[in-house]
Amino acid sequence: MLWLLLLAAVGPSPAAASVPLIRSVTVSVYTKKLVPVEDLKAEEVRVSEDKRERKVLGVERDRRPLEVAIVVDSGGTVAAAYRSDLVPAVVDFWKALPPDTKVALWSTAPAKITDFGGDLAAAETKLRMIAAAGGNYGFDSMIDACRELGRRGIPRRMIVYVGSGSLQASRTGTSALARALGETHVTPMAVLILPSARGSFSGGPSGDAVEAFDVQGYFAQVAKAYHGAYVEALSTLAVAQWLRQFAADLNGQYQVRYESEAGPEGVVKVEVRRKDTRVRVGRSVAEIARLE
């Protein structure tokens, strides 16, 4: 009995403590010409965790089911370019998504336009029937979309906001969106149309008194926190190009397995040793487990 107590006191042996742990992280890889990389090899990938290099064990295309919720600005700020620029850009983005992706659309009225798995042609017709006007309550739509994505439980869940920074919200609403992204494991992507880069805390569906806030800073922080993507379009004409980048990102996703150590996961960085490629590091399996 005494030797059991002594063994418990000293803890596990160094050999047991050093048993390697296998972790996995999602990585998007595409070229500067916005072509998804389809033949990535393990020897081209370098992974570090808290600045310590890790051994890459394998690289596989991420073919898990994907669902994308698109929130399109239908407010008065984009009225002049809504049908001419935004609708075609969103339709082309939908067409460019990986095969079998299920898509749902929301406006910033706020209102849901189409359900997941709906027909693209019918969705385009509904988008063009919208008369863009009024305020932009995109935060309400994004919260609703995140919650629905979470309930559906598909492995890969994305939300894409396309619109101006003239959003109306509340402190409660902005906090609720950040919380919903974490709780539902949804990855955010946003194309923010400038120069309208300041939203307002105001009345309407989100409530509260009028007060300006930094929309650019908010989306940048949310994208960083949840391993998403945030870009700024200098005009509505530039939206299509940024959405092509998002499509290349989603078509070029891999799951990278690497050797780690027991204990909390550190900050993971991934480099791809291939010329003219862009990389976005997504959430890891360990991070998703912590959120659950």
Task: Give residue ranges: language-model regions.
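Sec-dependent N-terminal signal peptides
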Residues: 1-10
